[in-house]
Amino acid sequence: MMTAESREATGLSPQAAQEKDGIVIVKVEEEDEEDHMWGQDSTLQDTPPPDPEIFRQRFRRFCYQNTFGPREALSRLKELCHQWLRPEINTKEQILELLVLEQFLSILPKELQVWLQEYRPDSGEEAVTLLEDLELDLSGQQVPGQVHGPEMLARGMVPLDPVQESSSFDLHHEATQSHFKHSSRKPRLLQSRALPAAHIPAPPHEGSPRDQAMASALFTADSQAMVKIEDMAVSLILEEWGCQNLARRNLSRDNRQENYGSAFPQGGENRNENEESTSKAETSEDSASRGETTGRSQKEFGEKRDQEGKTGERQQKNPEEKTRKEKRDSGPAIGKDKKTITGERGPREKGKGLGRSFSLSSNFTTPEEVPTGTKSHRCDECGKCFTRSSSLIRHKIIHTGEKPYECSECGKAFSLNSNLVLHQRIHTGEKPHECNECGKAFSHSSNLILHQRIHSGEKPYECNECGKAFSQSSDLTKHQRIHTGEKPYECSECGKAFNRNSYLILHRRIHTREKPYKCTKCGKAFTRSSTLTLHHRIHARERASEYSPASLDAFGAFLKSCV
């Protein structure tokens, strides 16, 4: 009822309002009508939405003299607070974020408040990110004779009057708590937020000398803080994960080779088992270097195993044949004779059945020969031994640095053909690995494995210090540097060290003055893509301001005629 009286009072003619010094009240009524007009504009897409800053300023600038009593003042404050914080849409955490953001902006120097108003951050984290970007941009531009760093920030802080601060907090608390107590509506996702702090002056022109001079006085090159780079961290994690996967694969392959015995076993059953193990090792090596031949190798191995099983059965039925075979294998005749076995085999050659032609010799030198299980191929550089010459050839590429496989599109070279095949998918856009949950496709199977952990929530890598779990081993490695204090990434220019490579990349842009992210509207460049995204809001507000007051009045009249 008090609100109705207030609105009747605000409907006075301009002359009567001037006599009672109520010009502000008439202005508030016009704004209320405008808000009512915006509230009915939920079905039209060409009209910009109302700016939450209008509601925040009304709440902050509301005066007791504009009301006819304390009850009406409290009711009006609740209404304005409800319009600003929008508890029917925002959650408690989001409302708290709005209040903290406003207070954070209010304690900054006015020059920084003006600079931040241009971007209108939605959260305290965005505001901090913008300030850190400004620090990176202006760290090399030091103004002599000025006070720098935290001391300058402390001087720029203008605290609120105690009475004003206390009353403002109480009204905020009472308004929000009252709404949550009596409201039964379930909070929805945040759709819009209140943006800058109270009593922020109008922003100057972009890049004004006054703005740049004050900003450069606040930061120095020695106060370079590490900044999060979300858009670069993803590619970095995938890159490191791929390298670790390759190292783990090579280590596993070497361990398998070492586990197989170097002596050639005697006896039919032991020989069969050793040949099976050696064939598995060969199949693993082939699949690591030539992924496309895995199916063929497994098929050949299965045929060999079936034939060897049949041979073992025949030997058990014929003990004399088995004895003759053992004597032949253990005798010195192999080193003296070399004969080729092809096609039809005699009884002495049964048990050799690989279905291929090969030569019996004391020294095996070709990949097509029967594996012996010995590591006869030794690297002259590091002394590492291999069972096959092809594995030694691939290993020597590590020492020589040879990259014979070159991409025809971009000229990038690789040491293995399988790596070239994976690289060419970047140019062709091929993504053969698809997620069964959401249908998203990837060019590498390793990327699909990482993606599937989003659906499963799997985090197999746990920190021993604090128990925090991660889905990737690279994330765990980065996290553990917080406990150890390790900073392996050092700047070659100034010697400053960082615990993440992404931080070092961002830091180097201070020396190179690189700004790779450029706005297509005005041509302004930035060091990070996230800052460019915030910059786009300036152009969005410019498009919204193109609506003239005359068009808004005509739209309001149209809405009234529809009622």
UniProtKB/Swiss-Prot annotation:
ZnF segments: C2H2-type: 377-399, 405-427, 433-455, 461-483, 489-511, 517-539
Start-end of Basic and acidic residues biased regions: 270-289, 297-352
The SCAN box domain, residue ranges: 56-138
Domain of life: Eukaryota
PANTHER family named among the record's database cross-references: ZINC FINGER AND SCAN DOMAIN-CONTAINING (PTHR23226), ZINC FINGER PROTEIN WITH KRAB AND SCAN DOMAINS 1 (PTHR23226:SF94)
Purpose: May be involved in transcriptional regulation.
Protein's name in the database: Zinc finger protein with KRAB and SCAN domains 1
Gene giving rise to this polypeptide: ZKSCAN1
